[in-house]
From Swiss-Prot:
Function text: Binds 16S rRNA, required for the assembly of 30S particles and may also be responsible for determining the conformation of the 16S rRNA at the A site.
Protein name: Small ribosomal subunit protein uS14
UniProt cross-references to Pfam families, sorted A to Z: Ribosomal_S14
PANTHER family: 30S RIBOSOMAL PROTEIN S14, SMALL RIBOSOMAL SUBUNIT PROTEIN US14M
HAMAP family referenced in this protein's UniProt entry, alphabetically: Ribosomal_uS14_1 (MF_00537)
SUPFAM superfamilies named among the record's database cross-references: Glucocorticoid receptor-like (DNA-binding domain)
GO terms of molecular function: rRNA binding; structural constituent of ribosome
Gene source species: Shewanella denitrificans (strain OS217 / ATCC BAA-1090 / DSM 15013)
Keyword entries, A-Z: Ribonucleoprotein, Ribosomal protein, RNA-binding, rRNA-binding
GO BP: any one term: translation
UniProt keyword annotation of Transcription present: no
PROSITE patterns reported for this sequence: RIBOSOMAL_S14
GO cellular component: cytoplasm; small ribosomal subunit
Recorded family membership: Belongs to the universal ribosomal protein uS14 family.
């Protein structure tokens, strides 16, 4: 079980990512556009650096919705492999069952 503070930190990061997504995308478009002048590009770089560090999508970590476990996360279900197996064995995941061949 992950600490409550880690879960809260990840929730805050997710909020920041959605809040600054449009602004970050616009600045990156200015930076990567070949027609942009050097001065405008430099201003965009400085503005991008001034944004909160946690607003970057690469800082967000996928976590299990039940336990907060960061490893063994399956996106399709939003659970870690351990909790997914437990739910499958209880028959709570439709269309999913233990493999047998």
């Amino acid at each position: 079980m992950a600490k409550t503070s880690m879960k809260a930190r990840e929730a805050k990061r997710a909020q920041l990512v959605t809040k600054y997504a449009e602004k970050r995308l616009a600045l990156k478009a200015i930076i990567s556009a070949p027609a942009t002048s050097e001065e405008d590009r430099w201003d965009a770089v400085l503005k991008l650096q001034a944004l909160p560090r946690d607003s970057s999508l690469s800082r967000k970590r996928n976590r299990c919705s039940q336990t907060g476990r960061p490893h063994g996360f399956l996106r399709k279900f939003g659970l870690s492999r351990i909790k997914l197996r437990e739910a499958t064995m209880r028959g709570e995941v439709p269309g999913l069952r233990k493999a047998s061949w």
